[in-house]
């Protein structure tokens, strides 16, 4: 059997509030607690047994001792001492708890509260001042930050515009370089080549003409030397300041304009500086 459950059932059946209840309700209650029929019967048996063994009662036949005045006096003194001690304790420790404070205590408490209020007011003022300074500092920093952001935005816009201008300039330069390399430069080189060819042709013609003049001049000098003995010469020199030279009169002399051109060209050109190869090229071109 389950001893603990059985013991609890016995204690339940011995309670005063349960003794007057019908057995049917007791059995139903014990069954609801999980007891079996055997355990319930055992519990009823144990509950009916007395808790303590019965002993025979003996009557106290002794007479009470009578008390005299001394006993009462001692009892009174002891009671008075206890009462006085209790009164002293109550007066010293308990009564002040319920006693109203004096005017001085009120004033002291009031002054203490005023001091606390003043201290709290100062703390609040300091807190308000610090909050105001913090707010001003925050606003100032916000303004500086806004200015810095505006400057940064302006700088970025400037850099963007500069980059766009640089890109356009690079594109223009690239276009110019492309145009120059594909159109302008070839045309210029072609024009320079043509100009050089024309200059070389002109120079070759001039050199050929000068060579012819030089050849004619040599022939004239030879002819004049051979005919000096038989042909009279009119010695009538012209003014050299006007750039004229002496004329040779004879039957085989050159015209005056050809002689003047030959002499003028001979003064300005040194035929020793002419490259024979260039002369050959000029003669071929001519």
Swiss-Prot record:
Belongs to the peroxin-14 family. This is Peroxisomal membrane protein pex14. It is found in: Peroxisome membrane. One of its GO terms (biological process) is protein import into peroxisome matrix, docking. It comes from the Eukaryota. It comes from Schizosaccharomyces pombe (strain 972 / ATCC 24843). One of its GO terms (molecular function) is signaling receptor binding. It is a peripheral membrane protein. Interacts with PEX13 (via SH3 domain); forming the PEX13-PEX14 docking complex. Interacts with PEX5 (via WxxxF/Y motifs). Disulfide bonds: none annotated. A motif (SH3-binding) lies at residues 61-69. Keywords: Coiled coil, Membrane, Peroxisome, Protein transport, Translocation, Transport. InterPro entries: PEX14 (IPR025655), Pex14_N (IPR006785), WH-like_DNA-bd_sf (IPR036388). Component of the PEX13-PEX14 docking complex, a translocon channel that specifically mediates the import of peroxisomal cargo proteins bound to PEX5 receptor. The PEX13-PEX14 docking complex forms a large import pore which can be opened to a diameter of about 9 nm. Mechanistically, PEX5 receptor along with cargo proteins associates with the PEX14 subunit of the PEX13-PEX14 docking complex in the cytosol, leading to the insertion of the receptor into the organelle membrane with the concomitant translocation of the cargo into the peroxisome matrix. Residues 122-214 form a coiled coil. GO terms for cellular component: cytoplasm; peroxisomal importomer complex; peroxisomal membrane; peroxisome. Residues 218-239 are annotated as: Disordered.
């Amino acid at each position: 059997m389950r001893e603990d459950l059985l013991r609890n059932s016995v204690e339940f059946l011995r309670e005063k509030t349960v003794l007057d209840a019908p057995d049917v309700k007791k059995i139903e209650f014990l069954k609801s607690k999980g007891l079996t029929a055997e355990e319930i019967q055992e519990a009823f048996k144990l509950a009916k047994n007395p808790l303590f063994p019965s002993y025979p009662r003996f009557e106290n036949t002794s007479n009470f001792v009578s008390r005299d005045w001394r006993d009462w006096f001692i009892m009174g003194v002891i009671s008075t001492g206890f009462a006085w001690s209790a009164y002293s304790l109550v007066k010293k420790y308990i009564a002040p708890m319920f006693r109203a404070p004096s005017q001085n205590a009120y004033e002291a408490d009031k002054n203490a509260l005023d001091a606390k209020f003043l201290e709290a007011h100062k703390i609040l003022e300091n807190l308000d001042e610090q909050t105001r300074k913090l707010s001003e500092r925050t606003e100032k920093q916000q303004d500086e930050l806004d200015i810095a952001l505006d400057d940064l935005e302006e700088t970025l816009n400037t850099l963007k515009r500069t980059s766009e201008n640089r890109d356009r300039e690079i594109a223009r330069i690239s276009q110019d370089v492309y145009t120059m390399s594909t159109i302008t430069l070839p045309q210029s080189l072609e024009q320079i080549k043509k100009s050089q060819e024309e200059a070389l042709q002109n120079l070759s013609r001039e050199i050929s003409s000068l060579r012819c003049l030089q050849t004619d001049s040599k022939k004239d000098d030879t002819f004049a030397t051979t005919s000096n003995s038989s042909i009279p010469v009119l010695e009538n020199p012209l003014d050299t300041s006007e750039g004229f030279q002496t004329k040779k009169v004879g039957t085989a002399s050159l015209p005056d304009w050809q002689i003047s051109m030959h002499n003028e060209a001979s003064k300005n050109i040194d035929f020793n500086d002419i490259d024979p190869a260039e002369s050959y090229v000029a003669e071929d071109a001519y």
